[in-house]
Amino acid sequence: MKLVAALCLFSISGATAFGNLPPSTSTSTSNRLQRTALFSSFGDTSNVEQPKPMAESKQRKKKLKTFNRYLEIESWKRGPAARDMEPILRSIGEACKQINRIVQRAQTDDFYGAAVDSDGNTLEDNIQGEVQQKLDVVCNKIMLKQFCGSSTGIISAVASEEEDVPRCCSDVMGDPAFSEGEYVAVFDPIDGSKNIDSSLPVGTIFGIYKCQPGKEVDEKTFLQKGNELIAAGYCLYSATTILVLTMGSGVDGFTLDPDKGNFFHTHEDMRIPSAGPIYSFNEANFHDFSEPVKRYLDALKTGSTSTGIRSNARYVGALVADTHNVLINGGIYGYPGTRTNEAGKLRLLYESNPMGMIMEQAGGAASTGVGRILDVTPTEIHMRVPTFLGSIDNVFELDQFHQYYSDD
């Protein structure tokens, strides 16, 4: 009945607007002009005011600092140490932009799938025993060049999750002038690279340490605890591209404007809730988890933890994406050890330490289940540790489950 009434109303209003048209196909000139004027006005937006949200967003962007401007201000506020970081962090911003462009073109420019040599043969597995993806190889080169080429005399060596051993910047750049520097960098060039085939989020993780004074830079230089990190951060390539950074006094986020090609300071002093509704674990491995972890996950699902929150599972399969979700909404990310692999999957230097520093600086916690991640002394550059990151109440309770329960 409503449809019939609407049609009748349209017929009446139409007759009023166009005149009482005869049943013939021809119309008077005046009627045609009336209809032309009426319909053409529908597409005329010259006098239409822009939606307020669009206008407000332009005004807001004018007030936001660019990433480079933020670094200038911070280097002025913090002194010499921050001034050393400025060219390094600028280079990281450029690396993230380059990787973002490659990620966006991965499907059209054939950057997905396993990496192959000039003869079309799949490359050997990397040091982690994983098949190297095309994206791994390309992004690793970008990170090497950006870190080592940021400025002579700052970064002396780099260690990549994709390479067997650390590399001197003089070797990367082919110039001995790049052999001297007070800092070393560690990074995972593309976290979750297999996600690219399915157009799912991926990320980049990095950390910067100071060299030990008076000692030659070698592999031992990199074997520092996470609490000695000078700076750490990640880039998330997803619906938006965001760079999250800490220099040891809080966490800030910068969103890439694809039109202007700049990162803007959109997230100031990021803080994780003390507890939250998200848990992010690969539950395909549930039956191989230790008893404390299994009991904790069961408690999360029923809301029978001390927080009283009944949690929701969210798991993308990329550390950066899953941890960022937890950082924003609260909860816990976990990659525990299993019965067959007690150390788990995540690398201490390239993944757990940088992400752990960010979580702690945002008011959260980072644990192995039995202790603070940032207090772990690495024994080799590709060392792995069980990793739990997130809201302080959630992570603390997981640690309690490890204390109260033991494997049967």
Model features per residue range: what roles?
Residues A115-V116:
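Helix-loop segments that flank and shape redox-cofactor active sites
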Residues M1-S26:
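N-terminal chloroplast transit peptides
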